[in-house]
Amino acid sequence: MKASVIYWSGTGNTEAMANEIASKLKELGADIKLVSVEEASIDDAKEAELLALGCPAMGAEELEEDYFRPYFDSIKDIIKDKKLAIFGSYEWNNGEWMELWKNECAENGIEVVDALIAYDHPDAEALEKCRELAEKLMK
């Protein structure tokens, strides 16, 4: 099963989550592509059966605007039939950006299998939840 983990990370926190998710997907037998959004192509999303997208909270509880937002907007129509999980880290407020992102997915006909947030750098518990997210994607 082809899986892509595509993420943007400014501090390394969301990247740590992406690495953990990708590692577990690979362990479970997925043919995995792990790529930062700056290097990602539309085909990375199009060719995957399973997709995990990661972006931390930015600004006023929003997705990163220079790379991640344009990429996400460009793939919305082609990921409607994918198994999708979304994830990211935050350092202030309460993680509202994830609820906004889930709602945006729903409004665009995109089903989210799981959504995961981690406060600051993911600790052991957050990394375990990353592995659980990968397991949910593989089911």
Model-flagged regions — what are they?
Residues 1-4:
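Extreme N-terminal starter segment of soluble prokaryotic enzymes
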Residues 6-8, 87:
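Short hydrophobic segments within beta-strands
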